Amino acid sequence: MKRILFLITMIVSAATADAQFVQVKNGRFMREGKPYYYVGTNFWYGAILASNGQGGDRHRLHKELDRMKAMGIDNLRVLVGSDGERGVQASKVEPTLQVKPGVYNDSILDGLDYLLYEMQKRKMVAVLYLNNSWEWSGGYSFYLAHAGEKNVPTPQDAGYQKFMDFMAKYATNEKAHQLFYNYVRFILTRTNRYTGKKYKDDPTIMSWQIGNEPRAFSKDAIPAFEKWLRKTSALIRSLDKNHLISVGSEGKWGCEGDMKCYERICADKNIDYCNVHLWPYNWNWARKDHLSEDLERSCQNTKEYIDEHLVICDRLNKPLVMEEFGFPRDDFQFALGTPTTVRDAYYKYVFSLVADNAEKGGKFVGCNFWGWGGFAQPKHEMWQVGDDYCGDPSQEAQGLNSVFAGDISTLDMVKEQVNRMSRINH
């Protein structure tokens, strides 16, 4: 009898522990045994802000987390850390976490620990991305350089087309992959010095994400790209059986326009849910001097893009999260306090697409707007060392896509969406 009671206790304890982690059941997110629909944001600089070194400001971190939590935002998408030497290129986020392969900045690691500790206290969860196809945090270009590639270009010097053509080498560079896998092993086997929990046992982490907008960068590289994603997801699963895994893909735009590629990378048995990103200005749906006039086209293209991906999510029975979307401020201004009329209209439309689908039992279960600027006070149009971090990384104008604490009309709309999503219980 005692043995039976012991086994029952163990089973119940295991089920309770599992329920603490965000899970996917029948194409939906579940958190603590309840359906989880959410409005989150991108807080890429969270680990830097939480650090005790350069760039760290824990007083501001607490204010930002408290403000977000008060609004009902409980899902933050965060960069684990930037890669590379400091002071090499103006467009890269500093300070970096991985200075050279296997050489780490303990201050940023401490910051990541502290961020998760503070998020845990507020019952928030994090989506942590490990790589980046773009130069602003190192990523592909960092690993290629340390795998022996010479004269690795930056978009600022060579232009984006030459940069992307060069980055296509990453998909087939096995040495670069091995350097990245070493990094994955290091991060996923870490123990948080503030909570004493191993990362793999911490429910504050919702998902490990392979990268920020991973791309093949050429149609010829797609097979190798897909193979790399599969190997990475399998590695993550071998190290961590508790957490969700996601790709971080933009969708069709990140798959060289190939929806079959998107379906294959989402169908991977180790990938738990699907992602899309939406960038009307970056994708030439909206022109900087005609933002208002191009709003209707941006909304129409957004709906078509989402619908196309939802078909695949329905087929795979996996949830969809739009984990990045943004729109410039009116008249392409950047300064604090400048109007956000057109942005607000775009946000309102995007939010309606998410909630309308979720309320009908669809697979569209959440979104993270880009990005949280909060209480930042940018000093320069382009970020310089010592400036506040905001939603726009260092390669972009500060304020371009940031939502600041003073953007009341936008934040009110976010709160309305939070309330609407929180009422969905199926």
Question: Residue ranges of each PLM-predicted region?
Answer:
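Sec-dependent N-terminal signal peptides
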Residues: I4-S13
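Boundary at the C-terminal end of the N-terminal hydrophobic targeting segment
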Residues: A17-A19
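Active-site mouth of glycoside hydrolases
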Residues: F21-K288, S292-L320, F325-N425
